[in-house]
């Protein structure tokens, strides 16, 4: 079994990561941690938050390797949407489960802005576990 989690440093992203790690431990599954930074053209300097996320991914991979979890990290920057990149990684890695974090939004916010989570839920070819930020693994 292989599990994919979208990595962000937000409370929602951290909740998703906790759940993905718990699922990986429970099922002796491989874990793919993907981080994608969407930028608008022209793409100049790599945003500082992207470099910070890459450093955190490296530390996370080492930490989880030490716990006996088979971890792969994927990090990229580009103009595609986060949801499309997450779905592409899911397909490339042939994952069995995607874990994503959810944030609370107003009904109007959901209609006007769209939703990365909704796009992943509807576009995934495997089950998706959606985690709220206040849930613990």
Where are these regions (language model features)?
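Small/aliphatic-rich secondary-structure junction motif
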Residues: 1-47, 65-69
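Short secondary-structure boundary segments
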Residues: 35-36, 97, 101-103, 132-133
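Short, surface-exposed alpha-helical segments at coil->helix boundaries
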Residues: 47-58
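Structural beta-alpha unit
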Residues: 66-98, 136-137
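Glycine-rich, Arg-bearing micro-motifs that act as flexible, cationic patches
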Residues: 100-119, 137
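Short, structured coil segments at secondary-structure junctions
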Residues: 116, 124-125
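Short, flexible loop segments at boundaries between secondary-structure elements
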Residues: 126-137
